[in-house]
Amino acid sequence: MQYSSKKNSYEDQNFQNRFFNSLNGQNKSSLNQNSSFSESSKQQVVSITYEEIGLFPRSFNRVFDRFFKQLFFDVENLVIQEYRFYRYLFLTTVKCLFILLFVPLGINFLSKNYLIRPVTEYYWNTHNHEIFLNSYQQKRAFTELKNFEEKIYFESLLLSENQIFFGLSEKNSTFPSSEKSQKSEHFSNQDEHTNDFYGKPKKFQTDSSLQQKNEEKVFLFENSKSLAFEPNLNQIHSSGFLIASADFSKNEVQNFQNLNLSNNTSQSKTDFASVFRTSVQKRLQVKILELAKHYNEESIEAITNFFADVLSFITLCYLLVRLEIQINITKSFLLEVFFGLDDSKKSLLILFITDLLVGYHSPNIWELFFQTLFDHYGLPESQTTIFLLVATLPVLLDVLFKYLIFRHLNRASPATVATYHAMIE
């Protein structure tokens, strides 16, 4: 019994050893197959990606290949397939550019007018007590108000104290002492007391509103013993002054009520000063309200522009990730169109873009761009920051253009690079 048990255990051990050896052999064979497959795949990848340079250029091989295809194969189907392929490339490019351009703009417009702006207006007008978004807007508002005050002061210097008597129109009766009577007197050379009393106009001033055709002019007459003939009045006024309106087309003078300047001069000055002061205060109040409303709207607009542009940028990034295949097709089509041009046109296009962005006149364009950008987002306009950006950004773009021309264009089209340098020189 002991001998039989030992024999069975020995056979089991032999069976286990043979089984594990067979498994190891299979694993080794599978590993060898995988290694051989990986080596063959590497060789295939290398053979696919690497193309040996032969005796003739590769363009000759492509030309001969195309020639034999047109000679021995069905040319009509090849032409139709090629046309369909380029049509697909063109439609894909147009569709991709349309989506990348108009979808972010549409998101910007809709979110700005129907989502972000109402929320911003509600928060800014209810929870915020400020009008100005930053100190730069406040400084601009104070500058405009100061200029308006200087304008009013300049207009007040042009007005004299006697202008309450000159420049009165028929529809303007500011002072009750200058009420027009309904009596019209014709010019006459005879007077009931003496022939030497004539009405002599002392001054004549009119507003711009009176410079219309057949409109009555208002001026001041002074009676004096002068032989120089001016419109002679039929009445003698003891005060020596008379306000009259003359209609020269009818040769008539319509009399106003006499003004006794000796009694009413101080009162007229006081009335004029009070009226002028009241009008100046009203104009200042109206201007201040206009400035407050304008800069409040400008602050809301700046905040709305910022959040709407952020949302548009997120949309653009999503489209760039989502439309990766269409973007690659678009790039290949645009590159093919670009390299399909002749050397002079390619050089002219490159020269136009580089001169526009980094040329001699580009600092003015960049300065205008940054000023518009700061106004768009309500940022304080700092000339130092603008000059710093204008001095650095075109230099970086110039270096980038030179690298692209040297790295890529010099390989793809050396004749274009030579033509470009010839145009620059």
UniProtKB/Swiss-Prot annotation:
Predominant subcellular localization, coarse grouping? plastid
Annotated spans, Insert: 159-278
GO terms of biological process kind: potassium ion transport
Q: Which reaction does it catalyse?
A: K(+)(in) + H(+)(out) = K(+)(out) + H(+)(in)
Q: How does it sit in the membrane?
A: Multi-pass membrane protein
The entry's protein name is Potassium/proton antiporter CemA
Question: One GO molecular-function annotation for this sequence?
Answer: antiporter activity
Compositionally biased, Basic and acidic residues: which spans? 180-192
